């Protein structure tokens, strides 16, 4: 992983609640960005 990816990882986790139904659309967007 590059430093850029390492910097974006915590930011993505912060935007991803990973709880409830919100995890579904958020996870899909996260995979698309990656």
Curated annotation (Swiss-Prot):
Belongs to the MSDIN fungal toxin family. Disulfide bonds: none annotated. There is a cross-link at residues 12-16 (2'-cysteinyl-6'-hydroxytryptophan sulfoxide (Trp-Cys)). The keyword Oxidoreductase does not apply. One of its GO terms (molecular function) is toxin activity. This is Phalloidin proprotein. The keyword DNA damage does not apply. It comes from Amanita phalloides. There is a cross-link at residues 11-17 (Cyclopeptide (Ala-Pro)). Toxin that belongs to the bicyclic heptapeptides called phallotoxins. Although structurally related to amatoxins, phallotoxins have a different mode of action, which is the stabilization of F-actin. Phallotoxins are poisonous when administered parenterally, but not orally because of poor absorption. Keywords: Thioether bond, Toxin. Residues 1-10, 18-34 form a propeptide. Processed by the macrocyclase-peptidase enzyme POPB to yield a toxic cyclic heptapeptide. POPB first removes 10 residues from the N-terminus. Conformational trapping of the remaining peptide forces the enzyme to release this intermediate rather than proceed to macrocyclization. The enzyme rebinds the remaining peptide in a different conformation and catalyzes macrocyclization of the N-terminal 7 residues. InterPro entries: Amanitin/phalloidin. It comes from the Eukaryota.
């Amino acid at each position: 992983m590059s430093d850029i990816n390492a910097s974006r990882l915590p930011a993505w986790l912060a935007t991803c609640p990973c709880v409830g139904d919100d995890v579904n659309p958020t996870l899909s967007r996260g995979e698309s960005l990656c």
